[in-house]
Amino acid sequence: MRSPTGCLGAQGRLVAELVKIVNKNREEKRTMKKLLALTLIVCLALCSFAAVAQAEEQTDEQVIAVIPKSLLYDYWQYVRIGTQQAGLDYGYTIDFQGTASDTDLEGQIKLVEDFIQRGVAAIVISPVDPDGMIPVLQSAQEEYGIPVIIMDGKLNADFPYSTVSTDDHAGGMFAGEKMIELLGEEGGKIAVISAVAGAVQEGGRAQGFIDKITENGNSNYEILGPFYGDGDRFKTHNILQDLLIANPDLKAVFSCNEGSSAGALLGVEEEGGALTFIAFDPNADMHDSIREGIITGAVAQNPFLIGYTATENAIKVIQGEEVEKQISVPVTYVTAENIDQPEIQNVLNPEEVIEQ
């Protein structure tokens, strides 16, 4: 039998060993804490280095801001395809952002201000207001050194490096010439339906059309309008319905933009195609109506080429090259007879072109 003293000695040794183990664990914990702290410092340093490297990479990459008049119509998506193709061809990143309405001046100003803060390489824009957008765009170019290119629109100022657009008045006159060919000397009442009163593009087309119809003083032609449906197809449809009730002898319709054309098409279809109808900016949903002759003729812009050329000019300015101050992109007349020809499809379906 072991003595109590021996047991106490054994217990003492056991306690001593336990103390050593505890102390060892404490040391290991301290070591682990130090290792964890060191690991965290290294990770933070690496993350900071990566963030700096990424920022430098983004700066070197060069971003071109492209701001359409709105994102409301298919037309602007075709413009976007053109801008992105130019970016791809020249090695630039395109940031395409727009508002939901083509009358949102404050929203478009905010987009420009955001792009200025980001320090983009250039701004390509279709201004919603040719006067209201002047201060912020002038600030971008003259105070921050960001070149400004106007795309499919107008700015009542001379500082932008270049403007790439359809000549809207000429496009309207072209439509008027086609309408005269269709109606002949007999003439008749023609309704002109536009989008927003005061809009530069649509207003130019409407005025060009009216100028052409009336230039020879032909009393056989009577212009009704322009009427404004805000580019909304249902409002435009209602306008045309009211016009037909008040003017059962209405012979023809000219619509000035994509939304107006979509709305007028609803009314023309209800009339069984009895009206002569020329539509500006036909979208993909209207192509079959052109094939069927419900839309007698359509005046198509080339949004892909407008977007591509405007972006290309921005890149040239960035690279120190000279660009043309004003570039007019021609329109194309589309009918049932030519809609499926390759050169027409290249204008109407730019998605397919970019994928070839």
Label every model-predicted segment.
Residues L14-K24, A51-Q356:
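A residue-level marker of the well-folded mature domains of exported/periplasmic proteins
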Residues T39-S48:
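Bacterial N-terminal signal peptides
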Residues E27-L40:
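Positively charged n-region of N-terminal signal peptides that target proteins for export
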